[in-house]
Amino acid sequence: MSYHEVNFIEMRVIGCLMEKEITTPDQYPLSLNALVNACNQKSNREPVTQLSEIEVQDALDALVSRGLVTEINASHSRVSKYQHRFCNTEFSDLQLSPAETAIICLMFVRGAQTPGELRSRSGRLHSFQSRDEVELALQSLQTKTGGPYVCLLPREPGKREQRYQECFCSESDRPAASFSSDTSDEYTQQLEAKVKELEAQVEKLNERINELENASGL
């Protein structure tokens, strides 16, 4: 079973199943309708999508055929439900700690993130006690047998921390990289502040030139 050949929609589907298994276990496994809603929800998703039932069903069918998702047909219900077998089950080759599971889940539904972002967004999945705990889990995911499962990306402009990205989605299918809104806002503010600083310096230079011209009688 290959863990490195999932496309973007398949990754979003697995991430949502992992998330709901932890955060709303009483509603898990998920029906197709519930899974579509989970994939397209506005909060805790990057990018926000508008996947159709057909797109999600196609992804589910592909994942079921590869043993990464199981379809459950309960005798008392006409609606099929789905649960993942991606990790941490008796059928999974991939066994992750709770911290590692939270990180992979977050990356599957929100893309590349910094250690600080992973810690602040993981509350319902896993309670990281420190940034060091996040770093240790990331290091483990980089060195696990069969990995690396995450990789460190180049530093973004205007960003102090570097982001980590999962290594499961094929690069050709990955959405175009974009800076987070927080990063973009921060970088824009820095540029605006620099422009104002330069404008103030130019104004002072012009004033000084005028003073020198007046003093020389020009």
UniProtKB/Swiss-Prot annotation:
Annotated disulfide bonds: none
Coiled coil location: none
Protein name: UPF0502 protein Mmwyl1_3509
Pfam families from the UniProt entry: DUF480
Source species: Marinomonas sp. (strain MWYL1)
Family: Belongs to the UPF0502 family.
Domain of life: Bacteria
PANTHER family: UPF0502 PROTEIN YCEH (PTHR38768:SF1)
InterPro entries in the record: DUF480, WH-like_DNA-bd_sf, WH_DNA-bd_sf
